[in-house]
């Protein structure tokens, strides 16, 4: 009879002890393999038998030192019989800003217990292994690479952006000393094991520990520079200290160990042109994080840590202090040890994204089996390739402003996946939001959810409820299915290429009254016979969406036309359109759309932080963003497409006709009005064709092109200002501007109607438009303000555009 299985916690402890035992066995065997080299260092020792085999330079011995001189920024390759440095010895490479590759061809490993320095870049390659002893000090001005893998001389001498190293020798690279590069990277590379138990510093570069049979080095200032091919099953261990702009530990199909100890063992600090980034990668193996990792950018903001492996393990001191921590693994269960690591990191202000991939035949499920609670603004995303589940008796809670996202089908492939909550989600003390996303053919089990009764949506977010459940839209077919339940909540699970078969794609929805969150994704190559969502009702919300395509052939019965919607009476937030919208003139059975916009035809709701670069052409009125703003609000939005009205009505760069409110917005597209523009028919305006509403803190810069016109020429802001009703008087405030040079307009408003005034808009030159002080006190260009003036810009842009 077999003995009873120990409890789960005991089994985890046994696995940790076994894992630690294997780790120390790896370290011990690696050190043992190089121990004989240490024994030979009683007397001083210098590299022996060096000869240039590519490039040119001089090698000279001076007592306890050796100096290699290589002129200018050249490259060179030296082959050595041995390359070791005794405790009281030094080797100096005076190689300017060039690079020198040192290859050891003898049969002994390299042991560096003295000083090794270079003005430029330095490569040391020894297939027998390399150890930097406790007294060893290495410093370079450029990149330092120490490797048991070899590289082709010709490839090295050519330079360029990439270099491949390969080898099959079971040797290790070990650092017990101090290795630094003041201006470049530090790379430690081996097939069997790379161990850092000393100090590595690269304030302006990347510190990389990589184990594998083949490694690609690639120059990059913003992403990973080293890529390890599967094979070798090597081990990377850090039990020392690493501080660099970026840090990477990779073992491909081996194991990565980030060990614990005093303080932060791995710290990425970033530079002006490199974000602070840490990578822990073992796609076919295991990453074990036992200590604290820190990543920050040069400006003090939080950096990024990416952890990806077939298996993930965390010790009792594991934590990440950064802006973002991304974890990726085939499937995952958040048990006690994981929950503690995530909780410590979330409380430190680190937002976390855990994603399962379903790789290696795994289920791709993501389960929460241990409770998680934290305070503060950090957010947690749990995204599963298959299902997400919260176990019975488990609680996820936040007190602060943190968000929680539970997403099934993270790959967006319509697996029919579900979000299952058998536990409790407590956001009663949080001002953040909770989102659950499942496939249209999947399901949702709500469990116990506690929301905050005093919650209110952040300004301009387009949010409606604190806790929202969405069905994922991953395909064109899913998009069409929205029409079956137009009052539901939907979210784009991925970018959708809507390239049509022969014929046009009919509108997805005739009338939409639910929530549609694009999640920042794009629907591209739309070819619409009408708008995408038809009419957006009073309770309808569309947010965080990009759409690209063309809309034409609107029904003869259509009164309004736009790429996103014919009419909007709800809320549109952070939606951006590109492409073209075309509506033609009188038809056999109807007059066709009266007003056409790049985003919507008629706006009676709210549009905020949105834009259109679509070209708009209409027989009647046309606007770059909105055809007619009918008692609606357009705020913090812009349009830059060309706008054309081919007959009878006017056109505006942002809005055709305004009867509502336009504020903190602008237009830069060319406005064409043809052929009728006279004292009877409306002409073009840089911002609006005509207005009987309110315009404030807005401007226009686009050329106004009208072949004929009445005296006074085009209006830089509007063709006319009118008082059509007491509830809609025409008001143009003094913080409205137009560029007198680019628009070709000498007046802001051409004419007035029904007792309105010309308003207080002001003309500025292009140079004045590029100077923040020209816009007066109402334009806020400060941190957190509405406006920004990028270097070299000829006009302001909206602050939110900087984040795109």
Task: Locate predicted features.
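Extracellular and secretory-pathway beta-repeat/beta-biased strand scaffolds
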Residues: 2-470, 476, 481-484, 523
